[in-house]
From Swiss-Prot:
A motif (BH3) lies at residues 90-104. The gene is Bcl2. The record marks D34, E35 as: Cleavage. This is Apoptosis regulator Bcl-2. It comes from Rattus norvegicus. PROSITE patterns: BCL2_FAMILY, BH1, BH2, BH3, BH4_1, BH4_2.
Length: 236
């Protein structure tokens, strides 16, 4: 596998492809507006991204229109040093880890989804509260996997509640958080290449508690008029 060097891989690409994968599991197609992605599908209503059941996909439209308007494009323009393309094995390993996490905590995720009560006005607060709690005691690969899976849950719930434009924002928040708060830790710990080497298909199980070193509790607490969602991780 190609080495990313000190600058690392493009976090935006990792986020976008992960969200696309999670939505596709539920039968939704997400048009990212990425110039390097597959051709875009026509949206049923004006917008940056479109969500359609796979059985109702419409013919492709020119990708440049959505690419110019995507709120994520400034992250690329201001990314600084050139980032390395993300090897497919990184996406595959992260997806497998996320799926394993989701299976282990299926009941918790189902409860969380039903109680998120996302709206365009509350989504940012929900995201910030969970992520702050998730990494309060430090960073490890298990918490990074949980971070991606939580973002996927928020995106799926947004689409289920007919608020698909929120996915634009969630993808942006995830990318910004990775760039500002997690990128240094990832690079200091061998980068995504190390994640693949440690937890890839030929190595130990992707979600073995021996490497995750945590027990996850996803809980919701009502405080006044606001719901505070916490992802509490405790060491074994």
């Amino acid at each position: 596998m190609a080495q990313a060097g000190r600058t690392g891989y493009d976090n935006r690409e990792i986020v976008m492809k992960y969200i696309h994968y999670k939505l596709s599991q539920r039968g939704y197609e997400w048009d990212t507006g990425d110039e390097d992605s597959a051709p875009l599908r026509a949206a049923p209503t004006p917008g940056i991204f479109s969500f359609q059941p796979e059985s109702n996909r419409t013919p492709a439209v020119h990708r440049d229109t959505a690419a110019r308007t995507s709120p994520l494009r400034p992250l690329v323009a201001n990314a600084g040093p050139a980032l390395s393309p993300v090897p497919p094995v990184v996406h595959l390993t992260l997806r497998r880890a996320g799926d394993d996490f989701s299976r282990r905590y299926r009941r918790d995720f189902a409860e969380m989804s039903s109680q998120l009560h996302l709206t365009p006005f509350t989504a940012r607060g929900r995201f910030a509260t969970v992520v702050e709690e998730l990494f309060r005691d430090g960073v490890n690969w298990g918490r990074i996997v949980a971070f991606f899976e939580f973002g996927g849950v928020m995106c799926v719930e947004s689409v289920n509640r007919e608020m698909s434009p929120l996915v634009d924002n969630i993808a942006l928040w995830m990318t910004e958080y990775l760039n500002r708060h997690l990128h240094t830790w990832i690079q200091d710990n061998g980068g995504w290449d190390a994640f693949v080497e440690l937890y890839g298909p030929s190595m130990r199980p992707l979600f073995d508690f021996s490497w995750l070193s945590l027990k996850t509790l996803l809980s919701l607490a009502l405080v006044g008029a606001c719901i505070t969602l916490g992802a509490y991780l405790g060491h074994k």
